[in-house]
Amino acid sequence: TSGTTGSQKLIPVTKKAQKFAAKYMALLVPKFSYNNFKYGYTYGRGLMISDIVMTTYTKGGTPICSATSGGMKSIKPILSLMYTSPIEVMEIKDRETSLYLHLLFALKEKNLMYISAVFISSILDLLRFLEDNYKKLIKDIRTGSINYSVKIDSKVKEKLNKLLKPDAARADFLEKEFSKGLQGICKRIWPKLIYIATVTGANFSVYDDKVNYYTDYIPIYSPAYAATEGMIGINP
């Protein structure tokens, strides 16, 4: 569990339960997202702040991970169709490295349609990280290679560099927009961005205004009612 209501707990999950959750998250959530935002829907990909990392294993070899990671792993074959981050990025354990690379591939995608994370606090972490690192990220887009300071396996880095390719025009555009300031930056660098998919409300609502500073009040949509224990429902 995430530990938002106390200490983290281990909840056993069967393959049947994984398939059930994956079916709803992979099929119904996009459908209801379309219903809510069809005026600007482009069928574009999104930036998803998640991973498919197995944290550890039991003595018997059963993998232990967050519910989100397990769910993402179960739909691994279609992840590249839904999200801008390559599979290799979702397999990185280090949080800062992961955020950097999630952003790098999202910044290359001028038609990004949505940003998604489990909790809105993660969205804010991402946007603050963008504020601190946008100059390095733009340089990487210009050169088509990942900054030397990003510590990742050399073979993984080689694979990702092949996917980047230099894009001076995109780098010039990003430099121009960031020079205007960070307020509303998301809507300016991703003009087709139409919603933020994440859990907010209640205790999380304190993050809304901080996120809105960067997004210029792009709608925040909580698509599902879910817990580690199981899928509860969809928010149409």
Question: Residue spans of the language-model regions?
Answer:
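Phosphate/ribose-recognition catalytic cores of enzymes acting on nucleotide-derived substrates
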Residues: T1
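Active-site phosphate/ATP/adenylate-binding loop shared across adenylate-forming ligases
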Residues: T4-P236
